[in-house]
């Protein structure tokens, strides 16, 4: 592998600009070689002066890069030292509190189940758990910094070696010895000491001396590009997707030849439509995950996932394919129910019952950690006013806004099984056209409108909670106003529908109000998508016209196509209203809704790419590469002390004027000496060397 590719694959994305600009140096060297005057047409002194002038410029650029790397490394190392001292203080405090309350100094002797502990013991248990997670994330940050150190040194060695080869000189090697090999970022070995001390602390204080268990907890995933999925996972993805395609073809043929024309298929479509949208969403989320990894958008950090254990795009494809097969089989079983002893209405219950069981399955199988993370996230979303709202919380609530049809179809299914289904008929899900009452899919009894507002309500109260926590009216209250327009839009749609059915004279009043609020909502959300969520139309965009100063994805066309797509699908409702209000075709509203619901899921899929890109660039601006695990809250005294430390002569000053350093943990100058500190072991992370000159 060429070193440029190796460097690109192994850098920490949030620190990209702080690495050696290897490709820029290569371009400088090759340009100088191509533009050099030929010895055949000019004298030798002119050629020497040309290369001497180039070398002066080249080494000046090297000095700037070296200064940048030294400064950044020193800043991150100082941050790591402060963080380590804080974690040691918190650990010592937890151990002291544990000793006072239980009379036991080690964690080994605390074997009571969590639900048998007192409130104080529960708090201590939670603190220890948080400390384990905090040390794990801290260790990851140390490995990233060590990787930064090794990659930059290798980069300087490679580019200076290439310099000497092209210019046929040894001045590059001399410059490396005189400058790089004595640079603080290379000579400083404190990072290795911190790694060893962290391993020792976790082993002796948190894992009862079990080094194997400690290293399993601290294990860092391979740095670099996404690792290939296990062969069996890849096999299952291909198998499931192939079966799903074949079953879909079978479904189309069965629908053509098996369905009876005197039967209404809409109850069946409404019941199975939500399942299809969920499968589509999972599949597109897999594509999102793949795209983020390829572009270097660190979605693992953004969603605060465990970097050591999380679902890849292959796993999401596998789940989507498996559920897709079950969905097709269930629908096929409904078509062929007349020749079986099982009534039609059993199959949807079996399908969705299995999906629910798959999600809440308490055994540690079938991606237990990921399912548990999703359940916790769903709980936080539906109890939004009582928790601080993180990125993953409002991201999931935004997804629910695009999946509102699933909630409405779930409400329809419950209503249909409760009020409309004829349990004594084997074809209960395919009633006669004359017998379809049509109560459940209308706004008549009010529940449907409430269900339609639930996703917008969740985001609305999340915005209010964020305003309460930050006291910032913009953007949180303004964003809440965006979601509040949905309430008016749904209300007037419901009033228009019910008044139209009853033939009231004021029907058109509600129709016009519905249209007005639909326009307001669409314009509001479109502007917010493009400007706030995606960060586009930045006045400092420079050559990236109508975009932003920095973009992650390689082609500008992606952004322009996404803008056009968002505009079209945000106003697709105009087509729906035009058709339903002018045509006499029965079930025209259901037909349009069935067509546009998957398109809305697709719109959210595109939105996800650019929303996470914008969040990733925010993390890059703050050089945030690991999760901030809060062990103890930061109070006013701690904040003052932190600012004093930042202003000390031996401290590292913030180089970004518009940014203030914030830590979620208490800061203390006291650094207690734990027993584990005398047992530190050296740990090294090997960076693949690519010494062959052909590979540079």
Swiss-Prot record:
Give the consequence of mutating residue 161 to A: Decreases phosphate efflux
Where is the protein localized?
A: Cell membrane
Q: Where are the transmembrane segments?
A: 229-259, 265-296, 310-337, 344-365, 389-422, 430-471, 473-503, 507-534, 554-585, 588-626
Q: How does it assemble?
A: Homodimer.
User: GO MF terms on file?
Assistant: efflux transmembrane transporter activity; inositol hexakisphosphate binding; phosphate transmembrane transporter activity; virus receptor activity
Q: Which residues bind phosphate?
A: 398, 401, 482-483, 570, 603-604
Effect after changing residue 570 to A/C/L:
Decreases phosphate efflux
Recorded consequence of changing residue 238 to F:
Monomeric; decreases phosphate efflux
Q: Domain notes, please?
A: The SPX domain plays a role in the regulation of phosphate flux. Inositol hexakisphosphate (Ins6P) is bound between two SPX domains of the homodimer. The SPX domain has high affinity for inositol polyphosphates and its affinity for inorganic phosphate is two to three orders of magnitude lower.
Regulation of this protein's activity per its record? Allosterically activated by inositol hexakisphosphate (Ins6P).
Altering residue 623 to A: what's the impact? Answer: Increases phosphate efflux
Gene Ontology BP terms: cellular response to phosphate starvation; intracellular phosphate ion homeostasis; phosphate ion transmembrane transport; phosphate ion transport; response to virus
Name of the protein described by the UniProt record: Solute carrier family 53 member 1
Residues modified to Phosphothreonine: 690
Q: Which UniProt keywords apply?
A: Cell membrane, Disease variant, Membrane, Phosphoprotein, Transmembrane, Transmembrane helix
Q: Which residues carry this modification: Phosphoserine?
A: 668
Query: What does changing residue 452 to A do?
Result: Decreases phosphate efflux
């Amino acid at each position: 592998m060429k070193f440029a590719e190796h460097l690109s694959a192994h850098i920490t994305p949030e620190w990209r600009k702080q690495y050696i600009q290897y490709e820029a140096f290569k371009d400088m060297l090759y340009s100088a070689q191509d533009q050099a005057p030929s010895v055949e047409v000019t004298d030798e002194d002119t050629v020497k002066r040309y290369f001497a002038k180039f070398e002066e410029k080249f080494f000046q650029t090297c000095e700037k890069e070296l200064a940048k790397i030294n400064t950044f490394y020193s800043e991150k190392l100082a941050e790591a030292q402060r963080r380590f001292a804080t974690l040691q203080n918190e650990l010592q405090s937890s151990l002291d509190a544990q000793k006072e309350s239980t009379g036991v100094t080690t964690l080994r002797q605390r074997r009571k189940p969590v639900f048998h502990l007192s409130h104080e013991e529960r708090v201590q248990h939670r603190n220890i758990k948080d400390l384990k997670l905090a040390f794990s994330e801290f260790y990851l940050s140390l490995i990233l910094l060590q990787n930064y150190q090794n990659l930059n040194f290798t980069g300087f060695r490679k580019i200076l070696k290439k310099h000497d080869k092209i210019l046929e000189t040894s001045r590059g090697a001399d410059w490396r010895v005189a400058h790089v090999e004595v640079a603080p970022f290379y000579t400083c070995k404190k990072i290795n000491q911190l790694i060893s001390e962290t391993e020792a602390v976790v082993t002796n204080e948190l894992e009862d001396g079990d080094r194997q268990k400690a290293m399993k907890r601290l294990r860092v995933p391979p740095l670099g590009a996404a690792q290939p999925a296990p062969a069996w996972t890849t096999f299952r993805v291909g198998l499931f997707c192939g079966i799903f395609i074949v079953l879909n073809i079978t479904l189309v043929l069965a629908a053509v030849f098996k369905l009876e024309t005197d039967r209404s298929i809409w109850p069946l479509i409404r019941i199975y439509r939500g399942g299809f949208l969920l499968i589509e969403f999972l599949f597109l989320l897999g594509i999102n995950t793949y795209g983020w990894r390829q572009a270097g958008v660190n979605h693992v950090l953004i969603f605060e996932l465990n970097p050591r254990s999380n679902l890849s795009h292959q796993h999401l494809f596998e789940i989507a394919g498996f559920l897709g097969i079950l969905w097709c089989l269930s629908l096929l079983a409904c078509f062929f129910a007349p020749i079986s002893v099982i009534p039609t209405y059993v199959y949807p219950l079996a399908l969705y019952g299995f999906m629910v069981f798959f999600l809440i399955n308490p055994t540690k199988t079938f991606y237990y950690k990921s399912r548990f993370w999703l359940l916790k996230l769903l709980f936080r979303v539906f109890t939004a006013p009582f928790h601080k709202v993180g990125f993953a919380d409002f991201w999931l609530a935004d997804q629910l806004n695009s999946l509102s049809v699933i909630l409405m179809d779930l409400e329809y299914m419950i209503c249909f099984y409760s009020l409309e289904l004829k349990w004594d008929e084997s074809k209960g899900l395919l009633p006669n056209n004359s017998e379809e009452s049509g109560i459940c899919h209308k706004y008549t009894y009010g529940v449907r409108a409430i269900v339609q507002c639930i996703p917008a309500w969740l985001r609305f109260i999340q915005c209010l909670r964020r305003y309460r926590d930050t006291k910032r009216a913009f953007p949180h209250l303004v964003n809440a106003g965006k979601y509040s327009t949905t309430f008016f839009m749904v209300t007037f749609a419901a009033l228009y529908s019910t008044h139209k059915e009853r033939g009231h004279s004021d029907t058109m009043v509600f129709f016009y109000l519905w249209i007005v609020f639909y326009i307001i909502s669409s314009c509001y959300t479109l502007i917010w998508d493009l400007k706030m969520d995606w960060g586009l139309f930045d006045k400092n965009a420079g050559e990236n016209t109508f975009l932003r100063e920095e973009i992650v994805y390689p082609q500008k066309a992606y952004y322009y196509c996404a803008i056009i797509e968002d505009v079209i699908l945000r106003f697709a409702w105009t087509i729906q209203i035009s058709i339903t209000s002018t045509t006499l075709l029965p079930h025209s509203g259901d037909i349009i809704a069935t067509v546009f619901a998957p398109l809305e899921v697709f719109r959210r899929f595109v939105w996800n790419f650019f929303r996470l890109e914008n969040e990733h660039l925010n993390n890059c601006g703050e050089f945030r590469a690991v999760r901030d695990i809060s062990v103890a809250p930061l109070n006013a005294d701690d904040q003052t002390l932190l600012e004093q430390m930042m202003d000390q002569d031996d401290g590292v000053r913030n180089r970004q004027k518009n940014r203030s350093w914030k830590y979620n943990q208490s800061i203390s100058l006291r650094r207690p000496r734990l027993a584990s500190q005398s047992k530190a072991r050296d740990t090294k992370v090997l960076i693949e060397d690519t010494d062959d000159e052909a590979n540079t």
